[in-house]
């Protein structure tokens, strides 16, 4: 018996991180859209499919192809802790454009990804309720949870709101079960060549310098020991959330000596200990074995396969990576959604 193919519309597709996960789970993307031209170029390069570049609001939603699923992550700067957290930011309205596509196409299911703050903070309670009320009016049962990508085969701590809606079937809504194993950054980064050679492209040369007035925490990997917003990566844990603002002094960095030898002297721990004692660290020279992660390394920490190609300038590529949904995370979500489709069809044919 031929396996049924479930079709999907991908919105706010970016470079295609979420698409990659849903495609690997078995969904067929029949229409995709993003506003950013370089992200669209990356999408075409990797998937060989046409992606419609431009504002989603420029398209006639009724004319989009029929589909079983709509998925995507509307731009989240208006809800993001890293942004201004302004519900009146025009980009905050795009969650409602996503909803309008769902209303026009009436898929069996939708999956929307966004920042955790949209699901947690009282500040956005009105936005949440407006979304839920309209989905209920459209006949969709909806559940949402804040999930952390590190629990789903991704070497990065990245909390995200995942909202799943199904037409008239709340009992069938499933979220993925955690894999039970976290992936430390070291496990991903140790396989790379030297920056700028072989499999390790897109080196970031932004200078790393110690802060004159460091913000200290109990861990050397928290607080702000250095100028700029880039923080060191603890190689023995999944890395911190990678920002879309990477490419300059906001790019995280690693101790390559510890990467090669976990028993090597921990320079960062020593610097942190000095700062805790009140020592002025602002004139301490940062050694050359402390360096910022490359584009290739950032992509790997985001869960992209090594053969995934990014287009545009180095900053374009960092931005595309930081804006992406980690593909392994997306694949686990998509697999849970696929089970919902299969369960529905099993009942229909029994």
Tell me the role of every PLM-derived stretch:
Residues 59-69, 79-247:
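Class I S-adenosyl-L-methionine
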Residues 11-15:
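Class I SAM-dependent methyltransferase "Motif I" SAM/SAH-binding loop
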Residues 16, 20:
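Glycine-rich SAM-binding Motif I of class I
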Residues 48-55:
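Conserved SAM-binding strand-loop segment of SAM-dependent methyltransferases
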Residues 43-44:
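Conserved SAM-binding loop
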Residues 211-350:
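C-terminal target-recognition/interaction regions appended to catalytic cores
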Residues 36:
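Conserved SAM/SAH-binding beta-strand->alpha-helix loop
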């Amino acid at each position: 018996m031929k396996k049924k193919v479930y079709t999907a519309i991908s919105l706010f597709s970016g470079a295609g991180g979420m698409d990659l996960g849903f495609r690997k789970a078995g969904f067929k993307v029949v229409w995709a859209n993003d506003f950013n031209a370089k992200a669209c170029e990356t999408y075409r390069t990797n998937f060989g499919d046409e992606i419609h570049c431009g504002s989603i609001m420029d398209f006639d939603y009724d004319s989009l192809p029929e589909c079983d699923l709509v998925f995507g992550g509307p731009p989240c700067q208006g809800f993001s802790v890293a942004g201004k957290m302004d519900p009146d930011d025009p980009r905050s309205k795009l969650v409602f454009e996503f909803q309008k596509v769902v209303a026009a196409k009436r898929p069996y299911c939708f999956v929307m990804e966004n920042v955790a703050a949209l699901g947690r903070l009282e500040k956005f309670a009105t936005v949440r309720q407006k979304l839920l009320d309209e989905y209920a009016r459209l006949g969709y049962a909806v559940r949402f949870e804040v999930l952390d990508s590190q629990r789903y085969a991704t070497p990065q701590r990245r909390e995200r709101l995942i909202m799943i809606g199904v037409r008239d079937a709340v009992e069938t809504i499933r979220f993925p079960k955690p894999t039970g194993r976290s992936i430390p950054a070291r496990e991903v980064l140790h396989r790379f060549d030297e920056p700028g050679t072989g499999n390790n492209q897109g080196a970031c040369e932004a200078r790393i310098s110690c802060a004159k007035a460091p913000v200290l925490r109990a861990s050397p990997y928290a607080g702000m020991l250095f100028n700029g917003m880039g923080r060191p990566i603890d190689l023995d844990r999944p890395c911190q959330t990678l920002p879309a603002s990477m490419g300059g002094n906001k790019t995280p960095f690693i101790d390559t000596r510890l990467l090669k030898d976990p028993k090597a002297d921990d320079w960062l721990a020593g610097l942190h200990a000095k700062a805790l004692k009140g020592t002025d660290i602002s004139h301490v020279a940062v050694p050359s074995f402390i360096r910022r992660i490359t584009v290739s390394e950032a992509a790997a920490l985001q869960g992209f396969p090594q053969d995934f190609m990014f287009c545009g300038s180095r900053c374009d590529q960092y931005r595309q990576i930081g804006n992406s949904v980690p593909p392994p995370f997306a694949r686990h979500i998509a697999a849970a959604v696929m089970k919902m489709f299969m369960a529905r069809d099993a009942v229909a044919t029994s």
